[in-house]
Amino acid sequence: MITLTAGISYVDLQFQGAHRVIATAVLQGPAGIALIDPGPASSLPVLRETLKRAGIGVADVTALLLTHIHLDHAGGCGVLLRENPKLKVFVHMKGAPHMINPEKLLASASRLYGDAMDRLWGDVLPVPEGALTILQGGERIEAGGRSLRVEYTPGHASHHVSYFCQDARIAFVGDTAGVKVVPEGAVWPPTPPPDIDLEAWSESLSRIEGFGAETIFLTHFGPVSPVGSHVSALRENLTNASRLAKESLARDGTDEEREAWFVDECRRALQHTMDENNARLYEAAGRFDLSWRGLARYWRKRAG
């Protein structure tokens, strides 16, 4: 595990064998251990082994804190509940029904990932309703020995929350503050369907800035500071990506051709600032074809 500060660490889940794609934060206190975004079931062997080396078993974990329910963040929860039925799972109210019955979530994901579902995500099992603590935003919760402020931060997903640890000055922001898998690289907005909302996203970024955190923690990937310049860069790239998607919709041709054009433009933008291998990590964290679909859906809904 990589230490952030006393009692707060994180695990590189080595998703699909790649480093710096998905991070799980670990909060350790005398009353128990909390994991923020435990990741997909396919990465649980790495999570278990890394925790074990730190002297932590799944039975020692008391809480799973979800920023949102996308499979790369929350897909492993049901398996962990089978191993430790005493776990409490904190989740936004809009995501809770899909944790209890993941059938619709899996159907939606299957349309995006097709035959790669099992390889990418592993077993996605239901979470018992009694294990859930439902969040709306505005709460203060205790988990992993820390007092955490919860804020509703939609835009990337309608069921997204962020957690702010006041004493450590760290905000755990999931995907709302984007993807930055290379420390010196760009910050990129993941915009998959179905509920991208650019106006809500902008408000959520202002809410994150309002925490006054010294560090924000991205699930993709890890701690980032200073916060202000990171958020400014994300706003700029979110504007650029949404503009590209809008431009693509005005192009002649099929949606497949529009999507391919958008993907090429995103790759070109990233490869101006880093080598091809690092640029590929960004696609592992948030595929550009899916980002086009999310933004295209947003613009088409706006057009009526």
Which stretches of residues belong to each language-model region?
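Conserved beta-strand hairpin/beta-sheet module of binuclear metal-dependent hydrolase folds
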Residues: 1-54, 60, 163-173
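Divalent metal-coordination and catalytic microenvironments
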Residues: 7, 27, 37, 47, ...
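Metallo-beta-lactamase
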Residues: 33, 40-42, 60-72, 99-152, 158-228
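Metal-dependent catalytic neighborhoods of phosphoester/phosphodiester hydrolases
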Residues: 75-84, 102
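Histidine/acidic-residue-rich catalytic or RNA/ligand-binding cores of hydrolases
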Residues: 227-236
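C-terminal regulatory/interaction regions
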Residues: 244-304
